């Protein structure tokens, strides 16, 4: 039931849009606009697997502006380095051996 209501509303909306588009196409309005944009980007990521990992990335963006008679190029270089710490090793408990205070687990209980 809910789906049919949604479909009816969608069909009504599309019908109104199509009628509006057909009315807009019959009027004689002429608009001309042109724009040219050239964008070039490259990214490089290098990761080394040593004790300290360094990641570097660079990107280059070139944009041409069509508004002036001579084309101007803007080149932007980005370079970023991230230094990551060494991997932390998990400390495991030594079970069954001596505890920190020097007594074994058998001697902890009081003698009866």
Curated annotation (Swiss-Prot):
Subcellular location: Secreted
Signal peptide: 1-24
Tissue occurrence: Salivary gland specific.
Extent of Basic residues compositional bias: 70-112
Region Disordered, residue ranges: 24-112
Principal cellular location given in the protein's record: secreted
Amino acid composition bias (Low complexity), ranges on this chain: 24-69
GO cellular component: extracellular region
Sequence repeats, residue ranges: 31-38, 39-46, 47-54, 55-62
Region span, 4 X 8 AA tandem repeats of T-S-A-S-A-T-T-T: 31-62
Domain of life of the organism encoding this protein: Eukaryota
Family stated for the protein in its record: To NG-1, also to SGS-3.
Protein name: Protein new-glue 2
The organism of origin for this protein: Drosophila melanogaster
Top-level taxonomy: Eukaryota, Metazoa, Ecdysozoa, Arthropoda, Hexapoda
């Amino acid at each position: 039931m809910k789906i049919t209501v949604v479909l009816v509303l969608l069909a009504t909306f599309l019908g109104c849009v199509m009628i509006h588009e057909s009315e807009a196409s019959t009027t004689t309005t002429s608009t001309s606009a042109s724009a040219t944009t050239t964008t070039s980007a490259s990214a490089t990521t290098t990761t080394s697997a040593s004790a300290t990992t360094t990641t570097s990335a660079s990107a280059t963006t070139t944009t041409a502006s069509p508004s002036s008679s001579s084309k101007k190029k803007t080149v932007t270089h980005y370079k970023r380095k991230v230094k990551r710490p060494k991997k932390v090793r998990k400390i495991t408990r030594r079970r069954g051996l001596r505890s920190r205070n020097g007594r074994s687990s058998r001697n902890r209980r009081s003698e009866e």
